[in-house]
């Protein structure tokens, strides 16, 4: 599994995980938080924490 410092390759570019946020709400509030964080990082992606509708998210950022 990925952790802070893990190497990731996105579109041929090598980056390192720099921040992970757990339990992010899957709604407008969560979107605002993620949008603000994306402005500070080179890349970001999300995974659902549960296999259900409107699951909270884990959001990963890399630089």
What residues fall within each predicted segment?
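Extracytoplasmic/periplasmic soluble domains downstream of a signal peptide or transmembrane helix
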Residues: 1-63
């Amino acid at each position: 599994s990925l952790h802070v410092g893990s190497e990731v390759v996105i579109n041929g570019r090598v980056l390192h995980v720099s921040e992970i946020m757990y339990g992010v709400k899957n709604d407008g509030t969560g979107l605002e938080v993620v949008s603000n964080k994306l402005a500070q990082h080179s890349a970001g992606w999300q995974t659902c924490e549960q296999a259900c509708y409107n699951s909270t998210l884990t959001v990963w950022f890399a630089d």
